[in-house]
Amino acid sequence: MLKRQVTNVNFSGAGQGAGAGASEAHSSVSPSPTGAPVAGDKIDPSALPPLAATSPDTDDNSGEDSGLVGSGAGVPLPSGLTFRFMGHEGRTLTPAADELLASLAARNVHDVVVSAPPLKLEPRYRRVFTPDAVAFVASMCRTFDGQISEMLRCREEKDAQLAGNMLPGFLPHTTHIKRGSWKISPLPARLMDRRVDIGDVATHDARALLAALNSGAQGVQADFDDGHCPTWERTILGLDNVIQACLGKLTYTDQETGEVVSMKRDSDSAVMMSRPRAWNMRERHMMVAGREVLGAMVDFALIMFHAGQSMHTRGVGPFFYLSKVETHQEARLWNDIFTWTEQRLELPRGCIKGCVLIENVLASFEAEEILYELRTHSAGLNCGMWDYAASFIAKFRHRPEFVLPDRSVYVNMDAHFMRAYRDNVIRICHRRGAPATGGMSPVARPGSDLRFPNLPITRRDIDM
């Protein structure tokens, strides 16, 4: 049996899921004393050693034995091993997972495994992880595997250069982009008014998500990144809630009063802008060809497969926030994924829009190139103050001249280095016809429901 240990993942709750500067969550795999099967072995599932039972309350991402037998990150799945990818309770597959994998096998898809859901979430699991949807995710992963691997390699290389005291700078070979007269494609009507978004809304909480959508704000950021604690249970709940919201069908039943709360009609509801997980986060409950799928691919692909056509037809999307982007090559990757998705789902080119969060010091030097790469799919750029400041710690932590003072007193938009960053983003966006939006303010609108004291309001003026 193979034992997996996952490190560098934050489990402290909403708002702490994948903070700025988080390094990639690597998986280290080592054979257990019982002896691990090797790639290519024909395995009789009944002969495999029993899995140790764990408490249903155990954190999915705690790093304990996940119940995955015979494969690890980067290790090809044995040809006879298809139905042994267990849920976090260490039991045999649930009927929902069994049906899913059998359906995939009937489609001649043998290299995809998805963890079983908690029993109480089987209906939602069936609704989100349909065979066609999972096959779509897998196809996306295979298509972009090479580009993603190269992107992650370039990140490691850049970090090594920074550790060697290299400093970032503006790119000399992209002068033609910076001197060109291009602009982004016109924005859809629903993105023309960007005064207020409610940000970092935890997706697993249907009541809070509905409160945000019905609040009267212009937009809602449904957050699978910083506002998401990526346990398997919360991920299933979050994906189902967001997909239903994107379809305009999300409801919540108050357990005390029995009242059923529904979304307002599209014209009165806030526009949904989902934020997939950042590139450094992996979804350890789904594997394609023996490799853990990136969380960003799972979030984006499932939302688009189930709700992309509906959002486009109704004029309410599909719109996304793209977080933790560091270079224009990463923006190009997102643009390629958008274009591929539009082709596969028979959507008009450019209908998917993405707002890139410039929340990393490296990205601030390539903001114009990032906007250029996404110009057909751009919904503008966003300034994330706290993540941007944190990126100085992540990238220059070994250099004493970059030590920051007390952030509660001195690190704000009045600081010179923060003003320079903000003004650069505004200048670029205004020149290129793109919205430049601001960061989050922890305030509640007057008369807001006090049952949601942690529901933040984000002010995002086009002119900041």
State where each predicted segment sits:
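Active-site-surrounding "flap" and adjacent substrate/cofactor-binding loops of secreted or lumenal enzymes
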Residues: 232, 236-249
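Intrinsically disordered, low-complexity regions enriched in glycine and serine
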Residues: 14-22, 61-64, 68-73
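Intrinsically disordered, low-structural-confidence terminal and linker regions
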Residues: 6-9, 80-114
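Serine/threonine-rich intrinsically disordered cytosolic regulatory regions enriched
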Residues: 6-10, 36, 42-45, 56, ...
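Conserved alpha/beta-domain cores
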Residues: 100-143, 166-183, 188-192, 198-204, ...
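Short linear, low-complexity motifs centered on an aromatic residue
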Residues: 153-170
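Conserved small/polar residues in nucleotide/adenosyl-binding loops
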Residues: 1-2
